[in-house]
């Protein structure tokens, strides 16, 4: 039998010996976020405030988006609206956990984003998933109007909400995080 002596390799890093669970930045780490795409305008198309109102509300907004698309880089994010609230109500009544509600509620804003993509297809409307976010510079160079769900991608891993099951992080939070 061979006897091997294994030495633990050490990688020099400011975070190597830091605890990352206490919050804040470890000493000596400066944090200054880089604005990845500062010229992009993120617009939320609300589920209840716009999509649920149908053609009379949606079409004038899309006309404005099309008129602005050549002047600005626009990323559209969609809310869920009444249908998402209905899903939350049923799933809560069935006593499903918060993560399941987040996953189920995320389907509705995705449906809304797909509808907008179809309506904007002739103008470069393009449905994208959260994982396509890194491709935004390419889509903008091609003259596209990227459209995505406003729901953050936590899904089943959404933290339980104090005093209820409705996910705290819904489309308003997702659009904010996207814009950040």
Model region roles, listed by residue range:
Residues 1-75:
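N-terminal glycine-/serine-/threonine-rich phosphate-binding loop
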Residues 56-61, 168-174:
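Charged helix-capping and loop-helix junction motifs
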Residues 88-170, 178:
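Ligand-binding beta-strand-loop-alpha-helix segment within the catalytic cores
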Residues 49-51, 81-85, 154-155:
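Short, active-site-adjacent cap segments at secondary-structure transitions
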């Amino acid at each position: 039998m061979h006897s091997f002596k294994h030495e633990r390799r050490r990688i020099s890093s400011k975070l190597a010996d830091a605890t990352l669970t206490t919050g804040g930045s470890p000493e000596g780490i400066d944090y200054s976020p880089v604005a990845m795409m500062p010229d992009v305008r993120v617009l939320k198309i609300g589920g209840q405030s716009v999509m649920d109102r149908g053609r009379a509300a949606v079409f004038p907004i899309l006309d404005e988006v099309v008129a602005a698309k050549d002047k600005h880089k626009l990323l559209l994010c969609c809310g869920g609206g009444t249908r998402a609230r209905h899903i939350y109500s049923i799933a809560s009544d069935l006593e499903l956990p918060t993560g399941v509600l987040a996953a189920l509620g995320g389907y509705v804003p995705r449906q809304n984003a797909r509808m907008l993509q179809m309506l904007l297809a002739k103008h470069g409307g393009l449905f994208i998933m959260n994982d396509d976010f890194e491709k935004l510079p390419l889509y903008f160079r091609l003259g596209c109007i990227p459209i995505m769900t406003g729901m953050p991608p936590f899904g089943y891993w959404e933290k339980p909400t104090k005093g209820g099951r409705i996910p705290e992080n819904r489309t308003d939070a997702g659009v904010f995080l996207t814009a950040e």
